[in-house]
């Protein structure tokens, strides 16, 4: 702040010296053009100095009005509508400071937004990756369990069919042998009774076949019940996993809300910092005004000593 003000004051003093030198050259030319008619009278010089002093006082009033203005637009309009060395310099300094502060704030805000976005993106990708891996593991385990159950059911079914076939053949052959042995021992009971025995044997075979079919159906039902129980257990596990996923999603949503809240807090901090920078700019303008006023007062006090040195050569 102090270094910048010293540069500004140096520029102001250089401009004043340059203006004084130009005025001295003008007066020298006027003296030469008068062709020995003498120097300007002290009255004319005093008028010139008074005009210059009035010009400076007018510019100081404009600067005072700029500092007491209620808004930035009003200040800029005052500086634009009243041209002058001091006003132009103050306007250029103010615009430069505003541009630098705005650029710094924009860069800081972009960096913070970029950092928050990258962090949020990385966390989201990590969560998606974990969810995909867990889903693949569950699908693979479910497929493996299903294949194992299918193989086990096929093995049990083939064994049951083989056992039933062997049992049916053994029973059929035993009944047939007993009937033939009874006929051979006691003789033929007659054609009628022989037909009755054949019919009874046929009915017994039908009943046995029905019992076998019902047994097979009962075994299938038992297998289906076991399968349903297994599927029910898998369903409960899937529901539990879904509940775990729901809890994780809620945690992720709360994390996202927390990140959003932190972003809003950072935005508020940036706004407060912007207001503080504007306040510092106003204080800087007030200090610049006081410094210029003090320098102009000092230059006004030394003006009478400058007049004789410029007139004496003639």
Curated annotation (Swiss-Prot):
GO molecular-function terms, A-Z: microtubule binding
Stretches assigned to coiled coil: 106-291
Region of interest called Disordered, as start-end residue ranges on this chain: 1-43, 114-133
InterPro entries according to UniProt: MTUS1/CCDC69 (IPR051293)
Any one GO cellular component localisation term in the record: spindle midzone
Keywords, in A-Z order: Coiled coil, Cytoplasm, Cytoskeleton, Lipoprotein, Myristate
Basic and acidic residues bias (residue ranges): 20-43, 120-133
Compositionally biased region (Low complexity): 1-12
Lipidation positions, renumbered (N-myristoyl glycine): 2
Compartments reported by the entry: Cytoplasm, Cytoskeleton, Spindle; Midbody
Broad class of the protein's primary localization: cytoplasm
GO biological process: one example: spindle midzone assembly
Family membership: Belongs to the CCDC69 family.
Role: May act as a scaffold to regulate the recruitment and assembly of spindle midzone components.
Protein name: Coiled-coil domain-containing protein 69
């Amino acid at each position: 702040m102090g270094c910048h003000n010293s540069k500004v004051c140096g520029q102001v003093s250089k401009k004043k010296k340059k203006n004084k030198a130009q005025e001295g050259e003008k007066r020298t030319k006027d003296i030469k053009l008068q062709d020995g008619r003498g120097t300007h009278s002290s009255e004319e010089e005093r008028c010139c100095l008074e005009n210059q002093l009035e010009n400076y006082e007018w510019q100081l009033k404009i600067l005072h009005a700029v500092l007491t203005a209620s808004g930035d637009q009003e200040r800029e309009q005052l500086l634009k509508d009243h041209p002058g060395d001091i006003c132009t310099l103050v306007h250029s300094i103010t615009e430069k400071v505003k541009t630098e502060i705005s650029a710094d704030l924009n860069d800081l805000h972009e960096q913070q937004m970029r950092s928050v976005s990258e962090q949020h993106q990385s966390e989201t990708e990590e969560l998606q990756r974990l969810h995909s891996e867990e889903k693949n593991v569950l699908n693979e385990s479910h497929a493996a369990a299903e294949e194992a159950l299918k193989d086990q059911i096929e093995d049990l079914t083939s064994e049951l069919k083989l056992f039933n076939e062997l049992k049916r053949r053994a029973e059929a052959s035993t009944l047939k042998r007993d009937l033939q042995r009874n006929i051979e021992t006691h003789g033929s009971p007659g054609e009628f009774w022989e037909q009755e025995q054949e019919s009874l044997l046929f009915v017994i075979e039908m009943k046995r076949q029905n019992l076998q079919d019902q047994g097979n159906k009962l075994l299938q039902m038992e297998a289906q019940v076991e399968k349903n129980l297994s599927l029910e257990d898998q369903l409960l596990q899937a529901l539990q996993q879904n509940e775990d996923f729901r809890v994780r999603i809620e945690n992720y949503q709360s994390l996202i809300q927390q990140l959003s809240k932190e972003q809003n807090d950072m935005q508020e901090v940036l706004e407060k910092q912007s207001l503080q920078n504007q306040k510092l700019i106003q204080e800087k303008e007030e200090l610049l005004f006081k410094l210029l006023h003090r320098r102009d007062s000092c230059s006004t006090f030394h003006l009478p000593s400058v007049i004789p040195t410029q007139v004496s050569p003639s």
